[in-house]
Amino acid sequence: MGIDFLFILKALIIAIVEGLTEFVPVSSTGHMILVGDLIHFNTQSGGFPEMYEVVIQLGAILAVVVLYWRKISSSVVEFLCYIFSFIGLKTSGDKRKYEKRLAESETGFRFGINVIIGTIPAAILGLLFHDEIKEYLFSTKTVAIGFIVGGILLIVIENNFRKRAKRSKIVKDIDKMTYGQSLLVGCFQCLSLWPGMSRSASTIMGGWISGLSTTVATEFTFFLAIPAMVGASGLDLFKFDYSQMNATNWISLILGFIVAFIVSLVVIDKFINYLKKKPMRVFAIYRVFAGIVLAILIFTKVIS
């Protein structure tokens, strides 16, 4: 069987869509479902399209790791140092040395705990209802609803946040986040299990409500994406039957991963710079408009 170049082209289109939408509040999953249906990428049997989307999401996540490597690596080192220092403090006679190490590594430890706390709610729901979510929520109809609902929520919550920010203090340093704030953001991340809602939009809205600045909420969203998506991806990749893979599939997989990674590198940098100057309203308006158009296309049976 020869190489299907048309299928590879379709796969690369999906990878570009993933890279463009994963970290902006418009729902990458929703767009991949929609575009996949439009170009007939989702018609291949055996579950390859679903597995492919998981792999290219990992490519997007790798972009976060590369761009924020200094923060991630230093936090991991400090997190482990704090744990070992705490153990040493309890078991060693040289308490002064370990107390100093605890103080020096506390920032990284708190950051790590915040990421863990923020990951737990969606991880629990995702594990408990993984199959139900895949069966009942992954459709163009639910995506259309998610686009509209998420867009309206973005407008309302951002307006309230900007009013509140004028009269009360907001957290502008990610290392100053509290455990309560990370838990609230994590609870909002559960909304992202609904395709069309957007993980980025959900967590940023949770950040606004908890008192985080837009930049801090967005960067925390990036960090939450690493365990959330690696965990969800691992489950799907473990279940997939690789014996049915052909040369076209493998080429699509490798190229798609690379393309999603490169596009995400560019988008993350541009998105953060955009947020420092302008509000999210443009994304919210786009979501509502796209949701309405999608609903019309479904109603008129242009797409199913």
Curated annotation (Swiss-Prot):
TM spans (from-to) = 5-25, 47-67, 72-92, 111-131, 137-157, 209-231, 248-268, 283-303
Q: Name the EC number(s).
A: 3.6.1.27
| Localization per Swiss-Prot or TrEMBL | Cell membrane
Signal sequence range: none
Q: Which reaction does it catalyse?
A: di-trans,octa-cis-undecaprenyl diphosphate + H2O = di-trans,octa-cis-undecaprenyl phosphate + phosphate + H(+)
**Any one of the GO BP annotations:** regulation of cell shape
Q: What is its main location?
A: membrane
Q: Which GO terms describe its cellular component?
A: plasma membrane
Q: What class of enzyme is it?
A: hydrolase
An example Gene Ontology molecular-function term: undecaprenyl-diphosphatase activity
Transferase as UniProt keyword: no
Could you tell me the keywords of this UniProt record? Antibiotic resistance, Cell membrane, Cell shape, Cell wall biogenesis/degradation, Hydrolase, Membrane, Peptidoglycan synthesis, Transmembrane, Transmembrane helix
Q: Name one Pfam family in it.
A: BacA
Q: Does the keyword Cell wall biogenesis/degradation apply?
A: yes
Q: Could you tell me the membrane topology recorded for this protein?
A: Multi-pass membrane protein
Give any extra note attached to this record: Bacitracin is thought to be involved in the inhibition of peptidoglycan synthesis by sequestering undecaprenyl diphosphate, thereby reducing the pool of lipid carrier available.
Family membership: Belongs to the UppP family.
Function (record text): Catalyzes the dephosphorylation of undecaprenyl diphosphate (UPP). Confers resistance to bacitracin.
This chain's protein is named: Undecaprenyl-diphosphatase
The source organism is Clostridium perfringens (strain ATCC 13124 / DSM 756 / JCM 1290 / NCIMB 6125 / NCTC 8237 / Type A)
